């Protein structure tokens, strides 16, 4: 909102500016926030921020609308007489503690579960600390969070290859591959600025995506593979780089293991077969491989979509090996070390010894998951519905904390059935969601500016509390701490404020001193400049080298080299299924206005992106009698959903694409097939069919044409 000159002159008397990180997504851009009369009233970009450089996306610009929206939850409520009844926090906490203790006595501690949500936007790590701690004390390993729909496969692959995580240095790169990602939606400030800066310096751009995204229009090479074939495409590129001897021979010789096995293996993935499987011309594959390998540096930006396949971990292993072959590791313009926390807790947050031999859900099925990710999480989300619906029932009580699985999880019909079967369901959230509607108790949560935050995602930062909580909202820290004390664990939760807890865990650092030393809240940038540290210290892997061939994978019964199996169903593998479902489905691409299922209540954002839709090519639409802006039905073997058709040439013929986060979009995805290494469900490359909807469809179908949507894009 604009401020008059008179108001600005009076700032020192009635308000002040503060520098904090944004919390509307995991990119965590820098913000200058104006606070007046106890409320946040204005948002500006922080020009000194190294990634966002003063920019803000549409979500960040409308934080005020989000914070003070009338649909925010104001006080605790319990379900009663078919509706909601206001209760006190004391009643809510006492009820939860009693229910959990009784379930523990009758069914054991594993019958009680927590499902932690989006770490960037609701349960920032301060809250996670307390949730982990309470679960350890209570003795339950039944805990879930949505990393399985984001980075599990990627993390397992990079940790298994490099020993650490990496981040592409796009701004300094000579060649950037955008693999199944659209930065204009997922990283619209820092990512877009970095790519544009590199392009101005002459960087080449390769986009691998069936959709024609903004950067695909500008790319030197745009590859549009069949869905689910990314792994074969990457292995074919590896074949080109090795067979044409375009790899960094010195790096491979000194710093890797398994090159000979990889070279032999890669010969199996020919360009001719890649053209047949991937639907990509041989010349395009060869051009992309040569361009990437011969540039002075190269990096690959990918997000979660390549993990949504039966070959998810292998796909990311192939991407990592492309970087390794070209020597683009820990050097400017390549894949930089994504360092872990410099300000790590000096006192352990976890109390694992209290768990004993308890196994988390899915531990036997996904043993390598436990090896690489047990520091971060303790359960496979893919199994969470099964842990409720199985006989005998394993999980009976659950606390949702900033998560909406009834919309965001695969096969939501099954998810809703599972949540409804629970003996007792609690949800801590900002607004009423589809998941909250199934709960017995709903609790109002703070948002980031209403509490202290600490995070290590894009750099370590402290986000100071700027204003008091909205109505009766409480922070995750307060909720878990007070619940722990009611359960009899008071000695483990002695802190009355989150600042006291942070001072304890991070001693000798204190929040006060850290903010004095770093007034903008940014303590350390995790992405370390390319310094080739492996030359002195090697790689943090069992061999001490970058592992092209993974002995660890072999010992766990998995292929030690990345391989390709392809989608569970496809035109070539299951022709009978393809005859019934002849189209490929892209499920869950991102929209810049939202973060998963969040912020749909914000009016300005809803005006720009009013509801769920399906992209379909004009040729495909004509084939099935579908018209732009009219209701259509998408069907898979799992279920069906009615939505609005957006006829566009920005998608490959024979494919249909729907965005993430809208109610109903996961009625057509399944949780029955998954990556056997990570447990990530298969939701890329599913087969579907389409038809026009009868009549005008449901009332919540938003009928807008592609041209109308483009007109709405400006504010």
Residue ranges and their predicted role:
Residues 126-208, 215, 231-235, 324-437, ...:
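Extended redox/cofactor-interaction regions of prokaryotic respiratory oxidoreductases
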Residues 219-225, 458-471:
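Short beta-alpha connecting loops at secondary-structure transitions
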């Amino acid at each position: 909102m604009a401020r008059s000159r008179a108001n600005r002159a009076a700032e020192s008397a009635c308000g002040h500016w503060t520098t904090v990180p944004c919390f509307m997504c995991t990119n965590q851009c820098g913000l200058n926030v104006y606070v007046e009369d106890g409320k946040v009233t204005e948002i500006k970009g922080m020009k000194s921020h190294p990634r966002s450089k003063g920019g803000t996306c549409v979500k960040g610009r409308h934080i005020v609308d989000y914070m003070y929206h009338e649909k925010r939850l104001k006080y605790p409520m319990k379900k009663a007489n078919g509706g909601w009844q206001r209760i006190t926090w004391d009643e809510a906490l006492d009820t939860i503690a009693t229910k959990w203790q009784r379930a523990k006595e009758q069914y054991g501690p594993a019958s009680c579960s927590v499902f932690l949500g989006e770490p960037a936007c609701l349960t920032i790590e301060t809250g996670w600390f307390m949730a982990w701690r309470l679960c350890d004390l209570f003795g339950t390993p039944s805990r879930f969070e949505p990393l399985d729909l984001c980075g599990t496969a990627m993390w397992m692959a990079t940790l298994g290859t490099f020993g650490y995580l990496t981040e592409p240095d796009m701004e300094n790169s000579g060649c950037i591959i955008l693999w199944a990602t659209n930065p204009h939606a997922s990283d619209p400030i820092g990512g877009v600025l970095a790519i544009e800066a590199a392009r101005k310096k002459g960087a080449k751009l390769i986009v691998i995506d069936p959709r024609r995204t903004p950067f695909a229009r500008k790319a030197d090479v745009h590859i549009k593979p069949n869905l689910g074939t990314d792994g074969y495409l990457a292995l074919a590129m590896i074949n080109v780089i090795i067979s044409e001897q375009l790899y960094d021979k010195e790096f491979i010789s000194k710093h890797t293991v398994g090159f000979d096995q990889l070279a032999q293996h890669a010969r199996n993935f020919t360009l001719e077969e890649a053209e047949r499987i991937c639907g990509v011309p041989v010349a395009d594959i060869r051009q992309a491989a040569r361009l990437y390998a011969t540039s002075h540096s190269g990096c690959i930006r990918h997000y979660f979509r390549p993990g949504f396949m039966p070959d998810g971990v292998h796909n990311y292993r192939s991407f990592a090996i492309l970087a390794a072959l070209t020597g683009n590791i820990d050097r400017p313009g390549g894949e930089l070390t994504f360092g872990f926390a410099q300000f790590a807790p000096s006192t352990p947050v976890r109390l694992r010894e209290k768990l004993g031999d308890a196994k988390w859900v899915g531990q036997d099925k996904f043993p390598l998951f436990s090896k690489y990710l047990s520091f971060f999480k303790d359960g496979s989300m893919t199994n969470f519905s099964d842990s409720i619906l199985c006989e005998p029932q394993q999980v009976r009580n659950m606390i949702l904390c900033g998560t909406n699985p009834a919309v965001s999880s695969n096969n939501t019909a099954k998810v809703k059935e599972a949540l409804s079967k629970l003996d007792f369901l609690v949800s801590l959230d900002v607004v009423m969601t589809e998941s909250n509607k199934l709960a017995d108790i709903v609790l109002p949560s703070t948002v980031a500016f209403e509490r202290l935050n600490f995070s290590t995602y894009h750099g370590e930062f402290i986000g100071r509390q700027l204003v008091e909580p909205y109505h009766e909202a409480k922070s995750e820290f307060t909720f878990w701490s007070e619940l722990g004390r009611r359960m009899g664990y008071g000695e483990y939760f002695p802190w009355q404020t989150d600042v006291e807890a942070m001072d304890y865990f991070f001693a000798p650092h204190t929040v006060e001193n850290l903010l004095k030393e770093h007034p903008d809240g940014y303590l350390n940038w995790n992405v370390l400049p390319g310094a080739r540290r492996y030359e002195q210290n090697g790689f943090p892997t069992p061999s001490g080298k970058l592992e092209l061939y993974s002995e660890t994978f072999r010992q766990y019964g998995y292929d030690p080299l990345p391989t390709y199996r392809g989608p569970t169903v496809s035109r070539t593998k299951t022709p009978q299924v393809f005859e019934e479902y002849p189209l490929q489905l892209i499920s869950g691409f991102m929209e810049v206005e939202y973060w998963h299922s969040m912020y749909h209540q914000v009016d300005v954002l809803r005006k720009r992106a009013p509801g769920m839709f399906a992209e379909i090519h004009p040729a495909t639409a004509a084939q099935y009698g579908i018209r732009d802006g009219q209701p259509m039905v998408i069907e898979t073997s799992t279920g069906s959903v009615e939505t609005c058709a957006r006829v566009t040439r920005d998608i490959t013929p024979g494919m249909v694409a729907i965005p993430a986060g809208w109610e109903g979009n996961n009625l057509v995805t399944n949780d029955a097939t998954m990556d056997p290494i990570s447990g990530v469900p298969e939701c890329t490359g599913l087969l579907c069919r389409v038809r026009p909807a009868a009549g005008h469809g449901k009332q919540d179908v938003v009928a807008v044409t592609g041209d109308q949507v483009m007109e709405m894009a400006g504010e």
